[in-house]
Amino acid sequence: MSCSIILPNLINFINNDNNNIFEKNNEIQKQQQEEENKSNQVNNILNSIIESKFTSLNPKLKIQETPNQYQIKALIPLNFNKEEISVNVKNNRLIISAFKEIKFENQEKTKLTKFEKYQKTINVSNKNLDFSSIKAQFKDNTLTITIFKQSFEKEIKINIE
C-alpha cells in the first residue's frame, strides 16, 4: 500500500476518534455538572435547615407579678401557630412547648423533613397559685399566660363532723 492511501485514512480515523473523544469528554463534564448541581441543591436545603433560627426556638420570657396574679409573656417564633403550642402544669412546673414538622421536596423529588421544637419549663412551686384559673392567649406571636394567686385572705367556714 502506498502512503498516499494510508495517510488520508489515518488522518480521517484520528479526526473521527478525536471528535468522539471530545464528545465523550463533553458528555462526562455535563453529567458531572448535573451531579454537582443536585449535590448543591441538597446541601443548600440542609444548610438552610441547619442555619435556621435555632435561637428563635428559645423565646424571651417576661414574668410580671401583681397582688392577684402572675402574667407570663413568651415571644413565640413567627412560624408557629396556635395549634402547635401547648401549655401544661405538671409537678409544680409550668411547661410551654411548641412542635412543628416541616416537609421539603425539590424538583428532583428529594424529600427532607425538618422538626422544630421549643420547650420552656418554669418552676411555679411556692407561689400559691390557683392552677385551675390558668388562662392562655396567643396573639401577634405572643403567648400570654395568666395564673391567679390563691386567696388565703378570705374566711372559709369549715364544717365539723
Curated annotation (Swiss-Prot):
Segments forming domain sHSP: 52-161
Q: Does the keyword Translocase apply?
A: no
Does this entry carry the keyword Lipid metabolism? no
Q: What InterPro entries does the database record attribute to this sequence?
A: A-crystallin/Hsp20_dom, HSP20-like_chaperone
Disulfide-bonded cysteine pairs: these are none
Q: Which SUPFAM superfamilies does the annotation name?
A: HSP20-like chaperones (SSF49764)
Q: Which UniProt keywords apply?
A: Stress response
Question: Superkingdom of the source?
Answer: Eukaryota
Membership in a protein family: Belongs to the small heat shock protein (HSP20) family.
* Record protein name field: Small heat shock protein hspJ
**Name of the gene this protein is made from:** hspJ
